[in-house]
Amino acid sequence: MDAVVTYRTRPNVYRWLSHGGLASAQLREKFQRRVDRMTKPSDERSEVQFVVEREGHVIGDCGFAITRAWTKDDAPTPHLVARIHYALDDAVAGQGIGTEVVRALVDHAFSLPDVHRVQADVFAGNVASGRVLEKLRFRREGYFVDDGVIDGAFVDACLYSLLRREWEAPDHPA
């Protein structure tokens, strides 16, 4: 966890993360909650977490949360939505690793038979992350003005998604 905390506390990394600038202890608590959700899944939500390594060094982390697709009147459904997240050490930016990570996440999410849709939320200013998603044919479905507050300032966000049938299409670059 030390390696994850090290890069996630760097301004060039945390400026693109929903938690903004956190102290090391706060990041550890956040990750412990994720681990707890991973080891104690509920019918409402479960989570999968990975670290990204290169040559024996942790260079990122990623994962996804799984929830049930919404239905009219909250009727039961087996259909699931995976919401992916990823963060990489800024030292490896621009090397294609983000694309590899997202491709692996989507592959893993769609290996679960009931996952119908994969989504990603990205700050509107994070052009590199948007480019990674678009390279894998995610569709930008929404632009949300003043969607959240990070370090006291409003931020805009974009929602991207990809459906199973699009990922499995013969012409997809997966």
Walk through the language-model features, giving the residues of each.
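Short amphipathic helical patch at the helix-1/turn junction of helix-turn-helix
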Residues: L88, F123-A124
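Short, Lys/Arg-enriched C-terminal cap helix and immediately downstream tail that follows
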Residues: R117, V145-D146
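Conserved GNAT acetyl-CoA-binding A-motif
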Residues: S111-D121
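GNAT-family acyltransferases
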Residues: M1-A91, H108, L112, D147, ...
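Conserved acetyl-CoA-binding loop-helix of GNAT-fold acetyltransferases
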Residues: G94-S111, V127-K135
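Alpha-helical hinge/cap motifs
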Residues: H85, G94-G96, G142
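Conserved acetyl-CoA-binding loop of GNAT-fold acetyltransferases
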Residues: E134-F144
